[in-house]
Design a protein with these regions (language model features):
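Rhodanese-like catalytic fold shared by cysteine-dependent sulfurtransferases
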Residues: 1-18, 26-59, 65-99
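Active-site flanking residues adjacent to catalytic metal/cofactor-binding acidic residues
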Residues: 21
Length: 99
């Protein structure tokens, strides 16, 4: 379930069909996020996940600011029946491009 930022970047560069999930607030997302990420705050994940993330077997890469909220979101997704969740911590440790 936990991977490094480097492993997440490698997946983003070499695979297709994954989702990057930003578990921060919309305001934080608007200030800067990993390219291609969608935002569902960790507080809204149980209400919005099944509407937005329709394939429970799709690879979902989850991050937040420091890693705490991404862990909460990843655990919530697993409890909802999602099977392919990779949590890679916080954007503060992301050494790659943001937008």
């Amino acid at each position: 379930m936990n991977i490094t930022a480097e492993e997440a970047k490698q997946i983003m560069d070499s695979e297709e069909g994954y989702i990057i999930l930003d578990a921060r607030t919309q305001e934080e997302y608007d200030e800067g996020h990993i390219p291609g990420a969608i935002v569902i705050s960790h507080e809204e994940i149980t209400e919005k996940a099944e509407e937005v993330l329709t394939d429970k077997d799709q690879l979902i890469l989850v991050y937040c600011r420091s890693g705490r909220r991404s862990k909460i979101a990843a655990e919530a997704l697993l409890e909802l029946g999602y099977t392919n969740i990779k949590e890679f911590g916080g954007i503060i440790d992301w050494p790659y491009e943001v937008e």
